[in-house]
Structures are given as C-alpha cells and as structure tokens.
Design a protein with these regions (language model features):
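Charged (often Lys/Glu-rich) extended helix/loop segments that serve as interaction or gating elements
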Residues: 1-118
C-alpha cells in the first residue's frame, strides 16, 4: 500500500497500542549508514497522531524517502477514517515476499500428523 498514514488509519496500533511494525527504507542504492531510532508523525494536526516507535532506519533517512511498513494487513486499511479530511486517498497494492519472512529461518515444509488432507 502506498499511503501517507497515521494514528487514524493503518498505523492505529503503532500509535495507540505501541506496536513496532517492521520497517525498511526503500531507496536505490541501499543506504549503508548505521540505523538510528525514529518516531513517526501522521498527517493530521492532532498530537495523538504520533507513533513513538522506536522504528530503526538508516540515519540518513530524509523527507521524501519511501518507508515500507510491514505487517499492516487488511485490518489496518479497514480502520482508516476520514478524520480531518484524510483517509480518502488512492490505494496502490505492491506485492513482494512478506516482511515477516525476513525474520524466519529457512525451513522445510512438513505435513503435521494432526492435519487431515481433504
């Protein structure tokens, strides 16, 4: 999803529950600068539109860079509101390997003994 979002949308859980979604900077060439902790602020004028993080990104991350925020899923999109006129933007679906797979070891798929194949 391409989205400039915040606490009143797909990043609700990051703001109000404190979830730290996995993030990565999308830039070519890749940055080789050391990571630092960032907080995110949403597009509204509301002080609750703040995601404390920390979200680790290269220290040279700047305005205008694209940041992929993983594991938002369908619920994040469904929770979007029109607060302060936001939330009605275009949605662009971009697919790749799920970010969660970056943190998993390669395993061989096996069929569990308690699974019935229909």
């Amino acid at each position: 999803w391409e989205n400039n979002d915040g606490a009143y949308g797909a990043l609700y859980d990051a703001a109000h529950v404190g979830w730290r979604f996995p993030v990565q900077l999308l830039r070519e060439p890749q940055s080789d600068v050391r990571d630092m902790a960032f907080s995110f602020y949403g597009p509204t004028c509301d002080d609750a539109d703040h995601m404390a993080g920390p979200f680790l990104l290269p220290a040279d991350t700047a305005a205008g860079d694209y940041i992929e925020i993983g594991m938002l899923g369908a619920y994040g999109c469904a929770m979007r509101t029109g607060f302060n006129g936001f939330g009605n933007g275009d949605t662009h679906v971009v697919t790749d390997e799920p970010m969660a797979s970056l943190y998993m070891e390669e395993t061989e798929a096996t069929l569990s003994s308690n699974v019935v194949k229909l």
